[in-house]
Amino acid sequence: MDKDLKKVVVLLAPPNMKNSKANKALFDAIKEMDDVAIFNLYEMPDENILNMDAWSRIISHANAVIYQFPFYWMSAPSLLKKWQDEIFTYLAKTPAVAGKPLLVATTTGSEFDAYRSGGRNRFTVDELLRPYQCGAVHAGMIWQTPFVVYGMGTCLLYTSDAADER
């Protein structure tokens, strides 16, 4: 994992990346960028996911941290939550994360209008992400406005093959 000492650390956490269109597109947009290290938690060996020493070095070296995940039941998938509980909880008490930006990049199945007062989900995504913001602030990080892609469960995604058939 130390070979990935980069300036931006992306914790990628879609449980089913193979079938993900939106998270795969976000991944494809950044995977070749210099100084970006992407760690797909669902493809890492178990012993690396919770390796405190390795994560401490990686995060200490980074200038920014990004959590990228599909929004599952108003939260992150379980493996990112486990990483937060076991790694971030420790790092939050050290200088490793202090002063660094934390960005959440997430995709939702529901459309934008579902995430508002009176909408199907009753709250905005910003409101639902408040625990992440609270954790960042508590750790001395700089909370960034979340990057949210809405409506992945409700939109039609066209491929070049589909366009050729029309």
Regions flagged by a language model, labelled:
Residues 2-34:
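N-terminal beta1-alpha1 ligand-phosphate binding loop
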Residues 13, 41, 107:
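Cofactor-binding loop segments of dinucleotide-utilizing enzymes, especially the Rossmann-like FAD-
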Residues 35-47:
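A short beta-strand-loop structural module common to alpha/beta enzyme folds
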Residues 46-53, 156-157:
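Structural motif
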Residues 53-133, 139:
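Helix-loop-strand module that forms the ligand-binding subsite of alpha/beta enzymes
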Residues 148-154:
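Active-site rim beta-loop-alpha module in soluble metabolic enzymes
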Residues 158-166:
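Conserved small/polar residues in nucleotide/adenosyl-binding loops
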